[in-house]
């Protein structure tokens, strides 16, 4: 996901300038909101779930669920604990460094 639907709109504009297909901006915005609304349901039915922010050039994991345990990472400042809780419906996630190379 991205932190803002306007990022997705800009990416489609860029794709079109490279010869790719277009998607109306309003369609992108409505799909963005619909997709975010489904995140809570998705997490509820998954034993393992990772959510990545693709707002910048490299994906960045902001949430991880494994069985009944959940973690969040807010190192990028685009996402705060409250934002992740609102997105996922999980308020008791633990803070962790989810993006360190092993």
Model-derived features: positions:
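A glycine- and Lys/Arg-enriched "phosphate-lid" helix/loop adjacent to the NTP-binding pocket
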Residues: 1-36
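A charged, well-structured terminal subsegment
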Residues: 37-41
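NTP-dependent small-molecule kinase module
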Residues: 42-102
């Amino acid at each position: 996901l991205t932190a803002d639907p306007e990022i997705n709109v800009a990416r489609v504009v860029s794709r079109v300038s490279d010869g790719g297909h277009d998607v109306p901006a309003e369609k992108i915005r409505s799909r963005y909101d619909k997709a975010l609304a489904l995140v809570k349901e998705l997490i509820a039915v998954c034993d393992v779930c990772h959510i990545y922010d693709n707002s910048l050039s490299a994906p960045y994991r902001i949430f991880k669920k494994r069985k009944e345990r959940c973690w969040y990472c807010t190192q990028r400042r685009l996402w705060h604990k409250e934002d992740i809780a609102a997105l996922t419906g999980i308020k008791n996630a633990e803070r962790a460094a989810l993006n360190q190379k092993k």
